[in-house]
Design a protein with these regions (language model features):
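Canonical positions in the second alpha-helix
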Residues: 24-25, 60-61, 96-97, 132-133, ...
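Short helix-capping/linker turns of helical repeat alpha-solenoids
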Residues: 7, 14, 27-30, 43-45, ...
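N-terminal segments that cap or nucleate solenoid repeat domains
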Residues: 1-36
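TPR/TPR-like (Sel1-like) alpha-helical repeat modules
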Residues: 215, 219, 228-242
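Hydrophobic face of amphipathic alpha-helices that form TPR/SEL1-like repeat modules
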Residues: 2-9, 36-43, 72-79, 108-115, ...
Length: 242
């Protein structure tokens, strides 16, 4: 029997079947099975939620350098799930996963260092971790890296690089990046002022329910910037933005 059938069953939300395949594999020391079993206990998928059991299986997988388990342990400490909230422990587990190349862990470290969660704010460290995740295509990291370049935090202010990283995240559909990119085009920061492109990116973010983008798009319709003046559409966008 393919021991990885538990992953397929889990993805299909067939938790009884996943447990059938997962339990014996986990007990035989398979780190991926141990992670999935921990996840099932953690979230109550097919089992009664049990944080103690979740941590037990996550730890077994983490000892074998399973990145998902390391991140899950970090998140348990970060959120105080079944343990006392401990940012230092969370950061330590994120660092282990990040050093194994996990983009989500790298992004989360960037967030912790940029926001000062359990540590002194350090924009240089934040930039380093965001960059590692961004280079792996992680949209939220690309967006945050763009913000650091725009504000000159941890790096020399560079509007061109701010645009570059916002663009990468925006093209992946990340609404906050689309909104920021639209503002950059609207203001002409690092790019030639371009109301057509501003409208394009405000519109993409607005379609995802981004309230500020909807409000800005309404403003463009009122003024006729980058689009033909259209008061009816302006009112429609304004209503959506609340």
């Amino acid at each position: 029997m393919n021991k990885k059938l538990f992953g397929v069953s889990f993805a299909q939300k067939k938790y009884d079947l996943a447990l059938k395949y997962c339990q014996p594999a986990a007990e035989q020391g398979d780190p991926e099975a141990q992670y999935y079993l921990g996840l099932m206990y953690n979230k109550g998928f097919g089992l009664k939620q049990d944080y103690t059991e979740a941590m037990n299986w996550y730890l077994k997988a983490a000892e074998q350098d399973n990145k998902d388990a390391l991140c899950s342990l970090a998140n348990m400490y970060l959120e105080g799930e079944g343990v006392k909230q401990d940012y230092t422990e969370a950061r330590n587990y994120f660092i282990k996963a990040a050093n194994l190349g996990d983009a989500a862990a790298q992004y989360n470290l960037g967030v912790m260092y940029s926001s000062g969660d359990g540590t002194k704010i350090d924009y240089i460290e934040a930039k380093n971790w965001f960059l590692k995740a961004a280079e792996q295509g992680q949209a939220k990291a690309q967006f945050n890296l763009g913000v650091l370049y725009f504000n000159g935090q941890g790096v020399k202010q560079d509007y061109f690089k701010a645009v570059e990283w916002h663009q990468k995240a925006a093209e992946q559909g990340y609404a906050d990046a689309q909104y920021n990119l639209a503002k950059i085009y609207y203001l002409g920061k690092g790019v030639k002022q371009d109301f057509v492109n501003a409208k394009k990116w405000f519109e993409k973010a607005a379609k995802q329910g981004h309230a500020e983008a909807q409000c800005c798009l309404a403003g463009l319709y009122i003024q006729g910037l980058g689009v033909k003046q259209d008061l009816m559409n302006a009112k429609k966008m304004a209503r959506k933005s609340g």
